[in-house]
Amino acid sequence: MEKVPMTARGEQLLRKELERLLKRRPLITEAIAEARELGDLKENAEYHAAREEQGICEAQIRDIEYKLSVAQVIDVSKMENNGKVIFGATVTLIDCDTEEEKTYQIVGDDEADIKSGRISVNSPIARGLIGKMEGDEVAISTPGGMKDFEIDSVEYR
């Protein structure tokens, strides 16, 4: 089974969500039992809604348990920062044309959220940065075409 990289933050968020779902599980079972007492199951909307909710909850639990089982948790905050862009690093780039500054953290696919500045390790930007060093200039394929950036800083937080 191939391991999938995940940040310590990503693991923590998944474990928190799993805990929430596991606490929800008995409440759903209770709702099914209460709905079952209402009578005819064929026309019992409460029963069918609770069973559907149970199915969704169980699927989410299985999904999270699987993700955690294949996760290779990488905590860069415990690594010595040598200025190299690696998985989990937070990288500040300067657009060579506009001098605009952008900061991204390179994370696993499931953790990516561009609005929060977290990009997937498999994204074109991250692939163009991995292995490069602070101070390097890089050409990265973006939706608007090739762009040149300078790696201003690399942090392991």
UniProtKB/Swiss-Prot annotation:
**One GO term of the biological process aspect:** regulation of DNA-templated transcription elongation
Coiled-coil-forming residues are: 14-37
Disulfide bonds, paired cysteine numbers: none
Single GO molecular function: RNA polymerase binding
Q: Does the keyword Transcription regulation apply?
A: yes
Entry keywords, A to Z: Coiled coil, DNA-binding, Transcription, Transcription regulation
Q: Which InterPro entries match?
A: GreA/GreB_C_sf (IPR036953), TF_GreA/GreB_CS (IPR018151), Tscrpt_elong_fac_GreA (IPR006359), Tscrpt_elong_fac_GreA/B (IPR028624), Tscrpt_elong_fac_GreA/B_C (IPR001437), Tscrpt_elong_fac_GreA/B_fam (IPR023459), Tscrpt_elong_fac_GreA/B_N (IPR022691), Tscrpt_elong_fac_GreA/B_N_sf (IPR036805)
Organism's domain of life? Bacteria
Q: Which HAMAP family match?
A: GreA_GreB
Task: Spell out the family assignment given in the record's similarity comment.
Answer: Belongs to the GreA/GreB family.
What does the UniProt record say this protein does? Necessary for efficient RNA polymerase transcription elongation past template-encoded arresting sites. The arresting sites in DNA have the property of trapping a certain fraction of elongating RNA polymerases that pass through, resulting in locked ternary complexes. Cleavage of the nascent transcript by cleavage factors such as GreA or GreB allows the resumption of elongation from the new 3'terminus. GreA releases sequences of 2 to 3 nucleotides.
Can you name this protein?
Transcription elongation factor GreA
Gene symbol of the encoding locus: greA
